[in-house]
Amino acid sequence: MEKLVLVGVDSGATKTEAVGMDTTSQVCVFTTEGPSNPSVVGIEKSSAVIARAVEKVLTSLGYEKPTPHIVAVGAAGVVNKSYADVLRKRLSVLSGVSADRVVVFEDVVAAHASVFLSSDGVVGILGTGSCVYGEFAGHSVRVGGWGHLLGDEGSGYR
């Protein structure tokens, strides 16, 4: 049976955390890197930090030239699909992971999915920035998350 390799990344303004799992052997590894919010550090640095985290996770799982089935990135600072697509393509180039195996979401959307899967609910992110996101009856609402210049009340930003 082919090993199914999954990598999840939480990309933020303070730090980047990545976790990987090989579902055949149930091995789980975790690594932390520096900030990778593309709105703060730029697309190039963001992509490089995330790619380094992905590489560390895959190396820890014992792969020299791994091909994960999916790399899912929840990234702060990614507020539209075109920006997410630019980050996805750049990350693919740097990591060597095929672009069709990389998905990039806004961090608060990824947080919602991790808690509620496809059900209704509300989540808040209160880190370097702040944002609240909810889904109900097929509709979504996002409040905040616009950065410190426009207002990040409730965040840890100084």
Regions found by a protein language model. Give the residues of each.
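Conserved phosphate-binding catalytic cores of ATP/NTP-utilizing and phosphoryl-transfer enzymes
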Residues: 1, 100-123
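Short glycine-rich, Thr/Ser-proximal phosphate-binding strand/loop in the N-terminal lobe
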Residues: 5-52, 140-141, 145-147
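Short glycine-aspartate micro-motif
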Residues: 6-10, 68-72, 121-125, 132
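Short beta-strand scaffold segments in enzyme catalytic cores
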Residues: 16-21, 113, 124, 130-135
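A glycine- and small-aliphatic-rich helix-loop capping segment at beta-alpha/alpha-beta transitions
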Residues: 22-27, 86-96, 118-122, 137-142
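N-terminal phosphate-binding loop and adjacent alpha-helix
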Residues: 30-66, 77, 81-86
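Glycine/GP-enriched mid-protein hinge/lid loop-to-helix segment characteristic of carbohydrate kinases
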Residues: 42, 120, 131-158
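Short beta-strand-loop/turn "lid" adjacent to the catalytic site in phosphate-handling enzymes
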Residues: 58-95, 101-104, 115-116
